[in-house]
Amino acid sequence: MTDTKELNYAIIGGGVLGMTTALRLAQKGHRVTLFEASPQLGGLADAWTLGDVTWDRHYHVTLLSDSYTRKILKELNLDDDMEWVETRTGFFTDGRLHSMSSSLEFLRFKPLSLLSKFRLGLTIFAGSKIKNWRKLEGMLVGDWLQKWSGKKTFEKIWKPLLRSKLGDNYKKTSAAFIWATIARLYAARRTGLKKEMFGYLPGGYGRMLEQFEKHLTDAGVDIRLNQSIESVSHKEGRVFIKSSNEQSEAFDQTVLTVPSRVVPKLLPQLAKEEAAKHTAIEYQGIVCVSMLLKKSLADFYVTNITDGNVPFTGVIEMSALVDKSEFDGKALIYLPYYVPEGHAAFDWTDDEILEQSLLGLESMYPDFSRDDLVAFRASRVRSVMAISTLNYSQHLPPSQTSVPGVHVVNSAQIVNGTLNVNETIKLAESAIPELLRVACESSAPQTPREVQHV
């Protein structure tokens, strides 16, 4: 038990953020119910089956310096199973593949002049030395990068890289985004590691999530899968949650981990100004193609694409990181299409996505044949990450909502990092003290109350 009263918590959303929040609250002695609309936990980190292979639905990697992810892995007795690998990085520029995996290869990179290379390196170094990231929130990322790198390097390198993650939304994104990206790359040095390495768990994130779910159950968390939430409301000191099965349950405290655009729909009692702030947050979406191939495309884990005629925004060859035995000896690649949440790409059929993807691969890899394709699937997610627009952190709605007993903890609150599993877990961990403080100060009952079914 803790110094707070035992309360009944509802966590809405069973991604890694919701799972971590549920675990920590349960470990503090509270009763926790975790609601998830899909048939499995994990959210963006969940697994699916591609042909005869089960692996992550979206591409993920763990860095040696990802301390929050590794803390969870240690709790699940999985950290010692991690495999750590040095990977190579490629650039597809001017119709050719180039390796950019070492300082020497960077110096030999012909598409950039020696001066441009110097300015590019200086930009990254300058970004790594910035301590107060908030100063960058008032400047567009394109303006900041052109100031340091010059227009030519921006057009040749930075702009395609920005578009690979942000699409046309890069035009409204603040320079804090690139600071966070550079900070993640320099995390290893800041934590005293000699070099950064990429890691994977044999069995993928699906294995971690399976163990995580068991850990939650052992901690006493009540997991409700296939339960969409229709509404959340406050009445007479309790928070009532109505699910898709028309059942209404009362809790002492509720935490929403859903995207901000969903919050006002679930919470009609939210103050108008607060609801408007949630609605104003723009999200970047993704159509993420998974392909199982008979053979590898190249030996690069990530290939950044700077040619505008390729439809997808990068090539991630997971089998350049993960031992091919995990994929029955085949190659697993991801082709991301990062697009705004209202983009027409979400209406493309699987056949249309497949054809575009195959044409793109044929334009990049002369040895690629359509006969190499073993299996194909496409994941579509409209709200992946919030766009860090100008002065983004100043416009965020508070975590503690205007509705008593209801909190929002979602990835839109990641203001000084990039969206990844480590930052998601970090967000959950940092939210717990505030959740407990509010619970302690609330007018919760002196003795535990059973969940009320209405």
Residue ranges of each PLM-predicted region?
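Mid-domain catalytic core of redox enzymes
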Residues: 227-347, 351-368, 379, 393-402, ...
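Glycine-rich FAD pyrophosphate-binding loop
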Residues: 26-50
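N-terminal Rossmann-like FAD-binding beta1-loop-alpha1 element of flavoenzymes
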Residues: 7-34
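Dinucleotide-binding Rossmann-like beta1-alpha1 core, especially the glycine-rich loop
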Residues: 51-133, 160
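Internal hydrophobic alpha-helix adjacent to the cofactor/substrate pocket in enzyme cavities
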Residues: 424-443
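Short FAD-binding loop at a beta-strand-to-alpha-helix junction that anchors the flavin cofactor
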Residues: 333-334, 398-417, 423-427
